[in-house]
Amino acid sequence: MSKVLVLKSSILAGYSQSGQLSDYFVEQWREKHPADAITVRDLAANPVPVLDGELVGALRPSDAPLTPRQQDALALSDELIAELQAHDVIVIAAPMYNFNIPTQLKNYFDLVARAGVTFRYTEKGPEGLVTGKRAVILSSRGGIHKDTPTDLIAPYLKVFLGFIGITDVNFVFAEGIAYGPEVAAKAQSDAKAAIDSVVAA
């Protein structure tokens, strides 16, 4: 039995294209893998705190006493990392906002990227500690950006996920959503077909 973690990050709730694709992914996965467990974390509906000068001190190894706010941030970071490590398939709904991922998703990454916990530095360079996992990125965009300099999402996510140890990464794109109903419908249809292939693999 596999465990699937779905991370939503769109601020558009039910109107979100990436949210609809992640819901479709969950439906298809449950149909094809009924014994698997699925956890959905909505980072927009339940946002994690923004990393600031106070909170960053809680995530670095130190013997200094922590403030109550730092204690809460450290406990949440531990919870998020334990959840991430406990799942086999990580599905990230990553819509494009101004050429990059939503703030809500970046805030999550800032809480799970911890030296000595999800990665470590060695004589040969950094080593990811979140291993044996597969990631699926569902990325909706208003325009057409795939394989162009304006797509900052795919390179960033490959680097970040690889840095913490997740190197098996598949991307599903829904592009041209803002180009009109016909283009948007085709984008959704093509993305769902790609999801079907990922789920069946």
Curated annotation (Swiss-Prot):
<dbReference type="InterPro" id="IPR029039">
    <property type="entry name" value="Flavoprotein-like_sf"/>
</dbReference>
<keyword id="KW-0560">Oxidoreductase</keyword>
<feature type="binding site">
    <location>
        <position position="10"/>
    </location>
    <ligand>
        <name>FMN</name>
    </ligand>
</feature>
<comment type="subunit">
    <text>Homodimer.</text>
</comment>
<feature type="binding site">
    <location>
        <begin position="96"/>
        <end position="99"/>
    </location>
    <ligand>
        <name>FMN</name>
    </ligand>
</feature>
<dbReference type="GO" id="GO:0009055">
    <property type="term" value="F:electron transfer activity"/>
</dbReference>
<dbReference type="InterPro" id="IPR050104">
    <property type="entry name" value="FMN-dep_NADH:Q_OxRdtase_AzoR1"/>
</dbReference>
<dbReference type="GO" id="GO:0010181">
    <property type="term" value="F:FMN binding"/>
</dbReference>
<feature type="binding site">
    <location>
        <begin position="16"/>
        <end position="18"/>
    </location>
    <ligand>
        <name>FMN</name>
    </ligand>
</feature>
<protein>
    <recommendedName>
        <fullName>FMN-dependent NADH:quinone oxidoreductase</fullName>
        <ecNumber>1.6.5.-</ecNumber>
        <ecNumber>1.7.1.17</ecNumber>
    </recommendedName>
</protein>
<dbReference type="InterPro" id="IPR023048">
    <property type="entry name" value="NADH:quinone_OxRdtase_FMN_depd"/>
</dbReference>
<dbReference type="GO" id="GO:0016652">
    <property type="term" value="F:oxidoreductase activity, acting on NAD(P)H as acceptor"/>
</dbReference>
<comment type="function">
    <text>Quinone reductase that provides resistance to thiol-specific stress caused by electrophilic quinones.</text>
</comment>
<keyword id="KW-0520">NAD</keyword>
<dbReference type="GO" id="GO:0016655">
    <property type="term" value="F:oxidoreductase activity, acting on NAD(P)H, quinone or similar compound as acceptor"/>
</dbReference>
<comment type="similarity">
    <text>Belongs to the azoreductase type 1 family.</text>
</comment>
<keyword id="KW-0285">Flavoprotein</keyword>
<feature type="binding site">
    <location>
        <begin position="140"/>
        <end position="143"/>
    </location>
    <ligand>
        <name>FMN</name>
    </ligand>
</feature>
<comment type="function">
    <text>Also exhibits azoreductase activity. Catalyzes the reductive cleavage of the azo bond in aromatic azo compounds to the corresponding amines.</text>
</comment>
<dbReference type="InterPro" id="IPR003680">
    <property type="entry name" value="Flavodoxin_fold"/>
</dbReference>
<keyword id="KW-0288">FMN</keyword>
<dbReference type="Pfam" id="PF02525">
    <property type="entry name" value="Flavodoxin_2"/>
</dbReference>
